Structure formats: structure tokens, C-alpha cells
A protein has these predicted regions:
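Exposed, low-structure sequence patches enriched in small/polar residues
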Residues: 53-236
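A conserved hydrophobic secondary-structure block that centers on an alpha-helix together
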Residues: 1-2
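Outer-membrane beta-barrel translocator/channel fold
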Residues: 7-58, 62-81, 161-166
Length: 236
């Protein structure tokens, strides 16, 4: 929905696919579950709402999303609902996220931006200065810049750094959620893959891109990536 040229609101809701554990985690299922079917543990829906503000030299967007076990939850199906407020009323049984981007841009020169994704954050750790070591601080961030190269046809050079903190995109398995009497996995994934950035948790990336449009139907691009990945921490 775009009531004004500078304002746009987006909303999506749907069901997520569950992964096939037969090739991802062999013998993962406990023997006493009574069912060795993926749908026994993965019954999730996904909802997202986002606001975009786009001006001549400034772009801002922010929003929230939620992974929630399959049930009738009107608050997650209504476009203008506040997901955080709704979960506080129905119980802490869902996986909430918040995100935002700020970009400064100047036509003919380039742009700079900062992005933040909050999967979970303990505000008390900000005062203790251990936000980067506390296991329940699960977030990702990116900052970068793009430069328009003069005297070359539609040529740009961009540099960005991305960091995915450990446990980001993961979530503790919740037992006895509404309508379920067993553990349900609510990771930020679809069909076993992250819904967010393509990096795995506990990774960072430095990326350099060069793009040039020589002709109408000819684009040339070159990319350099330096990716580091740390220890894979287990999650429930």
C-alpha cells in the first residue's frame, strides 16, 4: 500500500515449509515421539509488516516479523497489529524479530547505509558492555557504501561489511505452545534455510562489488568476498 509517493506499507502472511530431516539430521528424532514425521516438529507460519519512507536524499525502513506455530492467531493476521504487544497478551510462545535500515543517498555521487536485524536482545547487556558475548543477544548488522564512478557508463563500486552474531536466526524450542503438546522448532528458517541473510550464524563478510553497464543488454560485474565462519553452536 502506497498512500503517498514517499510512503509505502508492506504486509505478508503465509506458511513455512519444514525441512526434510532424513538428509539433514539422520536419527535426530527421539524414539519416544510417537511420530517420525517432519510436520510433528515444524508447524510454523510467518508474518511480516514493514514501513518504507523514501525521500530525495534519505531512505528509512523499519518493521517486524514473527515465526509462530500453526494456530488461529488474529493478531498475526491483521496488517496493522503490533506483534510485540500481541505476544505479551497471548504468552511468550513465538519468535519475534525487528529490523530497520537507514540510507543516505545523493544522485550522481553514491550512497551509504546501515542495517540492523534484532532476533533477540537483552537490554541489560548494553549497560554491561557484553552485548557481543551474551548468548541471548542474537542480532545481525551491515554497513556499506556505494560510489558512482564518473566518466564510466553506469559504473558503481560498493563495499559492505556484514556480521551475523552466534545464535541469530535460531530460537529455543518451545514446549506446550498453544495447540501443541510437544516441542516445536521456531528457527528463522524456511525449508531448512535462513529467511534472512545468506550467511550462517556466527559469520561475517567483507564484500566488494564492481558493476558497469556497457550496453543496453550487457552488464559486467565483478565481486570479491572474504567470509569468516566460527564455531557452530548447537541449539535445541
Amino acid at each position: 500500500i502506497s498512500p503517498f509517493k514517499f510512503l509505502r506499507y508492506s504486509f505478508i502472511v503465509g506458511s513455512l515449509e519444514y525441512p526434510s530431516q532424513s538428509y539433514m539430521n539422520e536419527k535426530w528424532y527421539p524414539e519416544n515421539t510417537g511420530s517420525n514425521d517432519d510436520s510433528f516438529f515444524f508447524q510454523n507460519n510467518y508474518t511480516l509488516n514493514m514501513v518504507d519512507l523514501d525521500f530525495k536524499h534519505l531512505h528509512i525502513d523499519f518493521g517486524s516479523s514473527v515465526i509462530w506455530p500453526n494456530r488461529f492467531a488474529m493478531g498475526y493476521m491483521f496488517p496493522l497489529a503490533n506483534f510485540v504487544e500481541y505476544q505479551n497478551h497471548v504468552g511468550d510462545a513465538d519468535n519475534l524479530q525487528m529490523f530497520g535500515d537507514i540510507k543516505l543517498k545523493y544522485q550522481g555521487l553514491g550512497e551509504i547505509w546501515v542495517s540492523l536485524f534484532l532476533d533477540e536482545l537483552d537490554l541489560s547487556t548494553l549497560l554491561k558492555k557484553d552485548v557481543f558475548t551474551y548468548t541471548r543477544d542474537m542480532f545481525a548488522y551491515q554497513f556499506g557504501a556505494k560510489y558512482v564512478i564518473p566518466k564510466l557508463p553506469f559504473a558503481t563500486l560498493s563495499l559492505r561489511y556484514t556480521k551475523i552474531e552466534p545464535y541469530c536466526y535460531t530460537h529455543q524450542s518451545i514446549n506446550y505452545t498453544p495447540w501443541f503438546n510437544h516441542y516445536i522448532s521456531q528457527n528463522y528458517t524456511n525449508d531448512g534455510y535462513n529467511i534472512g541473510y545468506y550467511l550462517d550464524p556466527n559469520s561475517d563478510e567483507l564484500r566488494l562489488d564492481f558493476n558497469i553497464k556497457q550496453k543496453k543488454n550487457l552488464n559486467l560485474a565483478s565481486t570479491y568476498q572474504f567470509i569468516r565462519h566460527g564455531t557452530d553452536y548447537e541449539s535445541q
